[in-house]
């Protein structure tokens, strides 16, 4: 009984927290993460996609450990 009551209070609290922290409280669940949704629709907009990597055919390996190959396969040259 106590566990059920605690779970109910926790769910109500988390639901209220979602609406309070939303940008627009009227459409709280729709506008909760607008920037991330934009990055999912346009992957080129994500900052993590802008990484430094070496293209195929370029030397890589022991004397030159970084930047990594774009394909992540290095056998003396990026493949």
UniProtKB/Swiss-Prot annotation:
Residues 23-51 form a propeptide. It is found in: Secreted. Its main location: secreted. This is Conotoxin Leo-O4. The presence of a 'disulfide through disulfide knot' structurally defines this protein as a knottin. GO terms for molecular function: ion channel inhibitor activity; toxin activity. It holds the Pfam family Conotoxin. GO terms for cellular component: extracellular region. Keywords: Disulfide bond, Knottin, Neurotoxin, Secreted, Signal, Toxin. Disulfide bonds join 53-70, 60-74, 69-78. InterPro entries: Conotoxin. It comes from Conus leopardus. Residues 1-22 form the signal peptide. Expressed by the venom duct. Belongs to the conotoxin O1 superfamily.
